[in-house]
Design a protein with these regions (language model features):
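ATP-dependent kinase catalytic cores of phosphoinositide-metabolizing enzymes
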Residues: 1-95, 110, 115-230
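Structured secondary-structure scaffolds
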Residues: 98-99
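Catalytic-loop of the protein kinase fold
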Residues: 103-110
Length: 230
């Protein structure tokens, strides 16, 4: 669909426009960490400094913070369209970030976040949690949600501190309001996700993984995940 694109596709279009290799930043990052892999650089602080230096170099020279902004400036026909799109996208992304943080959903890479260029709506691909062998959500993200430099630049500081924060706070207030019944909704969500989770592929799930958890086990796991969220 020409009206939809992922953030990853926006980056690839920018690379094609300026004749850059899309995978070059990954290669450069790996090369920068060769000293850590070979043991020339040891210690957590030294490795962290090496990673930070590599990230700063790539962010400054290869993946700048205005890629998404330039794409939307070239795509939308007028300033009115741009203003409406920017505000709608800010609200939509704030809600997506809130749900991601609430349900402990990680892996929000640019290829898994899609937006509609004609409406500003945000769609998440592969929007489901990952579970360990005990059925508890695995969340190893270093940040609670995805707000990259490119999105921050496009939203502007005023948009982030205004529409983005307000939309996220309004969603949190609605979830915690009396009568929201959020626990029941989350129980249903985790129950459905646990029932379709590929238990056979879990290395530490034990011999019962071939059969999968029983309905009683699923209820216990879902309850544990809801308690973790709440």
């Amino acid at each position: 669909d020409a009206a939809h694109c992922t953030y990853g596709e926006v980056y690839e279009i920018n690379c094609a426009r300026y004749g850059r290799e899309a995978d070059l930043p990954i290669s450069l990052f790996k090369q920068a960490l060769d000293d850590a892999v070979t043991g020339k650089v040891t210690g957590p602080e030294a490795v962290l400094d090496l990673r930070l230096k590599a990230f700063s170099d790539i962010a400054q020279n290869h993946v700048t913070e205005n890629i998404f902004s330039h794409y939307m400036y070239k795509t939308l026909p007028t300033g009115s369209h741009l203003w409406t799109f920017k505000r709608q996208l800010t609200h939509q992304h704030a809600l997506s970030c809130f749900v991601s943080a609430l349900l402990r959903l990680g892996g929000r890479t640019p290829q898994k976040i899609m937006c509609a260029k004609n409406t500003g709506r945000v769609f998440m691909l592969d929007f489901h949690p990952a579970f360990d062998s005990k059925g508890i959500t695995e969340f190893v993200e270093p940040v609670p949600f995805r707000l990259t430099r490119n999105l921050y630049t496009f939203f502007t500081p005023f948009g982030v501190r205004g529409d983005f924060v307000v939309a996220m706070a309004a969603a949190a207030q609605a979830m915690s309001a009396p009568g929201a019944n959020i626990e029941t909704q989350m129980m249903l969500f985790y129950r459905d996700q646990l029932m379709v989770w590929p238990w056979r592929r879990m290395s530490g799930a034990g011999p019962q993984a071939l059969l999968g958890p029983t309905p009683a086990d699923v209820r216990v796991m879902a309850r544990a995940n809801v308690d973790e969220v709440m």
